[in-house]
Regions:
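Ligand-binding pocket scaffold of soluble enzyme catalytic domains
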Residues: 4-7, 307, 342-349
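A charged, well-structured terminal subsegment
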Residues: 121-167, 329-367
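Short, conserved, surface-exposed binding loops centered on an aromatic residue
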Residues: 260-263, 297-300, 326
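Surface-exposed acidic, glycine-flexible loop patches that form ligand/cofactor-binding
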Residues: 89-92, 296-299
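A short secondary-structure junction signal
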Residues: 111-112, 142, 207-208, 282, ...
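N-terminal beta1-alpha1-beta2 submodule of the flavodoxin-like/Rossmannoid cofactor-binding fold
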Residues: 1-87, 151-155, 165-293, 350-356, ...
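Short, glycine-/small-residue-rich phosphate/pyrophosphate-handling segment
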Residues: 94-135, 301-340
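Short, catalytically relevant binding-site loops at active-site mouths
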Residues: 229, 276-278, 313-314, 342-344
């Protein structure tokens, strides 16, 4: 087969991910592999996409080979997906088999894979295999064996001529443009400051939603338009930020100032984005990737966060999951999420107003919602990586994690360890085993009942 590898790394040839597809090329010499550094050359693809599309047309199999970048693909790879659709060229991909191969540290790799699967299936491709490699897997013989087995199965499936059926739902069209009503009754901002960031161009529905929030909030609010914000380029994956959280772009454009000054000053942060394909725009993604100047540290601790979204978010469960992940990781509280899905100005206005009120109220009482699996699981992945292999070059993260007690490994819980060791020994004695098992449900609620009892007897107990 002629196999075309579409590389998603901004590092081009120096991509870790491409080492995995090259390994497959070595193990399966009967197939002809060709690489294109799509993300690294997206600026030239903006001018000339034709050559690449000709290669796609000739290919028997297309491999989307990409690194994870903030729950998704890199902004430049995202831009490539947009270009194909803007120029109505997706028919070149239709009817072809696709493989997805990602490398990462497995922090929300599933959302990136789901995004690329959705895009490939939207273009009429059949996804014959999905592989999520840890970035260092290739050095382990067991992982090489696994990848080789994947290749054998996936290439056979791709060559069979039978395309697997699609697993993602087609994305719904969206043509609604919100236009606000005049004269909003203001929310009392109680001295709080709001930062509103949008990728909505003037005249778009999402821009109008962002501006509406600003008007309602009154007081101290600032709107950052990502279309006007100077951005020299996307994250280059150079990891210089790992040492001291200084981005290689420095203050040569406007991104660092938004994260370092405007975001830090704000009490309420509003992200106002329009859905573009299955995510936000590549412009928004460029800004989001550059958030990595704070590497693996939360950058919105204690802030209230509001999302304003234009588009059918309820049909994009994957994107909804990314929103939760991002905010649970950022340390902020997702106070409200408003979309223009009601397609009704008055209802959307009410929802925006409700969001502003909710954010103020949550801030007043200092509410932070507990994290779900997205935040709890993700924090454990980072904790273990920064403690271990990634301590260098992520020196600044290690410092932060130590200072903020992020190294909460279970092996430090001596009391719990002693108790479970004792119980594990005692359970071998039949009489004790019977007694424990009979009363297991009671054992589990006993400590909670004790708390309730102390509150009942002294209601002042926190
Ligand atoms: C800015 C940035 C963002 C990243 N985001 C994620 C992420 O969300 N999840 C993850 O597991 N790994 C993430 N990574 C790790 C890379 O995906 C991983 O190192 C990958 O193997 C790099 O491959 P490449 O050399 O082909 O670019 C990120 C790395 C960088 C530099």
């Amino acid at each position: 087969m002629k196999i075309l590898v579409l590389g998603g790394s901004p590092k081009g040839e120096a991509s870790i991910t491409l080492r995995y597809t090259r390994f497959l090329g070595m193990r399966f010499p009967e197939h002809r592999f060709e690489e294109v550094y799509v993300a690294a050359s997206v600026r030239s693809l903006e001018k000339n996409l034709g050559e690449l599309i000709a290669k796609v047309r000739e290919a028997d199999l297309v491999v989307f080979a990409f690194p994870l970048y903030v729950c998704l693909v890199h902004a430049a790879y995202k831009r490539f997906f947009e270009l194909v659709e803007e120029r109505a060229l997706s028919s070149a991909f239709a009817g072809k088999p696709a493989l997805l191969l990602a490398t990462s540290i497995h922090w929300h790799d599933h959302t990136a894979l789901e995004y690329v699967r959705g895009m490939a299936e939207d273009w009429g491709m059949g996804v014959c295999g999905v592989y999520s490699a840890g970035m260092d897997d290739l050095v382990k013989a067991s992982e090489r064996n696994r990848l080789e087995a994947f290749g054998r199965l996936a290439f056979r499936r791709a060559a069979s001529g039978e395309l697997p059926r699609r697993e993602t739902a087609p994305r719904p069209d969206w043509d609604y443009v919100y236009a606000p009503q005049a004269g909003p009754a203001r929310v009392d901002p109680r001295g709080l400051r709001a930062l509103i960031v949008t990728d909505g161009a003037p005249g778009s529905g999402i821009r109008a939603m962002a501006e509406r929030f600003g008007e309602l909030f009154g007081g101290d609010s600032e709107l950052v338009d990502l279309n006007a914000l100077p951005m020299k380029g996307g994250c280059q994956g150079c990891i210089q930020c790992g040492l001291d959280n200084r981005c290689t772009y420095g203050d040569s454009d406007g991104v660092q100032a938004v994260y370092r000054e405007k975001l830090r000053r704000a009490d309420i942060v509003v992200w106002a984005y329009g859905i573009r394909d299955r995510y936000w725009s590549a412009r928004a993604k460029t800004f989001i990737d550059r958030r990595f100047l704070d590497t693996h540290q939360p950058n919105a601790v204690g802030k209230q966060v509001v999302y304003l979204v234009s588009g059918p978010l309820s049909a994009h469960a994957n994107l909804r999951q990314i929103i939760s992940t991002m905010e649970e990781f950022s340390g902020g509280n997702l106070a409200a999420l408003v979309t223009d899905e009601p397609r009704d100005t008055a209802a959307i206005d009410r929802a925006i107003r409700g969001a502003a009120e909710c954010a103020v109220e949550c801030h007043q009482v200092g509410y932070q919602a507990p994290r779900t699996f997205a935040g709890v699981g993700g924090a454990k992945v980072f904790r273990d990586e920064i403690w271990g292999k990634l301590r260098f070059p992520f020196v600044a993260d290690h410092r932060y994690y130590k200072a903020h007690h992020f190294y909460d490994f279970p092996q430090k819980e001596w009391g719990a360890r002693l108790k479970t060791t004792l119980l594990r020994a005692l359970v071998h004695i039949p009489a004790i085993r019977r007694a424990i098992l009979v009363d297991m449900k009671r054992h589990m609620v006993r400590p909670l009942d004790r708390v309730l009892e102390s509150i009942r007897t002294s209601p002042g107990t926190p």
